[in-house]
Swiss-Prot record:
Regulation: Activated by the C1Q subcomplex of the C1 complex following C1Q binding to immunoglobulins (IgG or IgM) complexed with antigens to form antigen-antibody complexes on the surface of pathogens. Immunoglobulin-binding promotes autoactivation of C1R, which results in the cleavage of the Arg-Ile bond in the catalytic domain.
Disulfide bonds: C71-C89, C146-C165, C161-C174, C176-C189, C193-C220, C250-C268, C309-C358, C338-C371, C376-C429, C406-C447, C451-C577, C620-C639, C650-C680
Oligomer and partners: Core component of the complement C1 complex, a calcium-dependent complex composed of 1 molecule of the C1Q subcomplex, 2 molecules of C1R and 2 molecules of C1S. The C1Q subcomplex is composed 18 subunits: 3 chains of C1QA, C1QB, and C1QC trimerize to form 6 collagen-like triple helices connected to six globular ligand-recognition modules. Within the C1 complex, C1R is a dimer of identical chains, each of which is activated by cleavage into two chains, heavy and light, connected by disulfide bonds.
Effect of G297D: In EDSPD1; uncertain significance
Species of provenance: Homo sapiens
Chain segments annotated as transmembrane: none
Protein's recorded name: Complement C1r subcomponent
Keyword RNA-binding appears in the UniProt entry: no
Domain of life of the organism encoding this protein: Eukaryota
Enzyme class: hydrolase
Amino acid sequence: MWLLYLLVPALFCRAGGSIPIPQKLFGEVTSPLFPKPYPNNFETTTVITVPTGYRVKLVFQQFDLEPSEGCFYDYVKISADKKSLGRFCGQLGSPLGNPPGKKEFMSQGNKMLLTFHTDFSNEENGTIMFYKGFLAYYQAVDLDECASRSKSGEEDPQPQCQHLCHNYVGGYFCSCRPGYELQEDTHSCQAECSSELYTEASGYISSLEYPRSYPPDLRCNYSIRVERGLTLHLKFLEPFDIDDHQQVHCPYDQLQIYANGKNIGEFCGKQRPPDLDTSSNAVDLLFFTDESGDSRGWKLRYTTEIIKCPQPKTLDEFTIIQNLQPQYQFRDYFIATCKQGYQLIEGNQVLHSFTAVCQDDGTWHRAMPRCKIKDCGQPRNLPNGDFRYTTTMGVNTYKARIQYYCHEPYYKMQTRAGSRESEQGVYTCTAQGIWKNEQKGEKIPRCLPVCGKPVNPVEQRQRIIGGQKAKMGNFPWQVFTNIHGRGGGALLGDRWILTAAHTLYPKEHEAQSNASLDVFLGHTNVEELMKLGNHPIRRVSVHPDYRQDESYNFEGDIALLELENSVTLGPNLLPICLPDNDTFYDLGLMGYVSGFGVMEEKIAHDLRFVRLPVANPQACENWLRGKNRMDVFSQNMFCAGHPSLKQDACQGDSGGVFAVRDPNTDRWVATGIVSWGIGCSRGYGFYTKVLNYVDWIKKEMEEED
């Protein structure tokens, strides 16, 4: 119970009055003038009212009234619910009277009346007595409307919930058992079973009040709806009791069963129906009763069984069904895969996976696929190389093998340390349908240019001035440039040109960034070079130490030109190698300088070359000083030739390289770049020392070579 309190003083009015107390949850009631003596010849009634849904509880804290036999003189009378709860007077311990003590007075409703009455005097044996009166407290107590009130003797006990009663603080409400609906009077219940729905895979269904008598005038519809792919089975339990007639079939009450809209039975009497296999996932039970009868009704248990699909069968020997089961039911599935090196095919479509699901009608939702051998497709073309089949020609399916190779002797396959070229070039069609190499994976090999290996190396020792023309293939790295006039260069790799910085930014010229860069390769004749066409330049890189404005300082006279497109190497177009040690600059070592420069004061139309020895740096330094020249001759340069030889590079040869044959590797190396000198064939020639710039060259080329 909830007990709520509120102190509300209540005073009595004059004789004959009535005092209603406002609806509060608790308060107090006293006699007039309390705790002073109360007046004589006085009567009033106090009406204590609490909110609806509560009862009134009253307890006296102090009580001191004139005692008398039967409380005839002064008294307090308490009444509630049209009944008297007692008449009280005196005080505790007095021989006369009827004091209330600590008794609790409780009303059944939300009202209680307290009547206070005094006579004309308070005398005892001629002595005037003074009595203080009373002090009482009341409180609102929750009324449990759902508790049985017939014990209280009420003529019309309330509430009258037909089924279930629910009490709450200050009130109550009624509800009904399953299968019934609460009516508008909020107390009575009416059977309602016209649209009961069951969707679980199994369960129980029964008539209302089973196994007690079912109500009259029922029109019940119990619908069972389970997922498609399930079939319902019905099993009736004992007792089965539906009102019937000995001569007429089910004239009063009847249970009709429908499966997929078709009637499969109509039942009544006391004989339990047989177990029913409905072969349906939708069943309706219609139960009708008349206005009379006391039969106990019926109850059944329904269960479901899953529909089965046929065993899956493969279409070829390469298909694998994972975890094959002895039986497949609705919603079961199987996964089909292929043996290694084969792939799933559905129609003409390649599948990455295959799953088939058993449908609600007992069929698989998709047909079994086939397995076809993996096809890696045509192998990728290898730039500057090709491939050949080591298995059946033109067959690119699983386990086929090919061998990539490079176009030798101009290209060589890039190999890893410790691996052979043949291993690098072998690719197999894998089970994943890709060509793959054991070391490189899917990445195809790379054919790198072979440097310094001319097919027709030079053998004669002719001079440029008055010398013999170079033959095709003698200097296949030779580049002819026409930028600020004729110049030369050498091919590095298959897309880089090594040349002198001063051919791009000549000394005693203003710096120009928009000069035409014409580059020609692949022939020894200028006219034929022109016919082969110019090679566009993507990028120019000049060494940062080069100073165009310092005419006597050729420090850093080296530059790189990156071609827009790689060139295809052949007998007349091959790169030269870079030096890797100082032995290429040993005194007296012979090298070759080739170019299209001035020949006997005339412009050459054909490539010519000269054979020159590496000179002593100190001799070159002395020779310069003897000529009163202030030119810078640094450690990044070397000199070649001799004043007595009358052989040298000349105008138009600048940018070409000083080529030396390495006897250990039989490769030609660009040890220097034609940089500067004094006239043509008038002494020493000076060259940029390439070895000192190899790191810069490789960085600029980003190791493309």
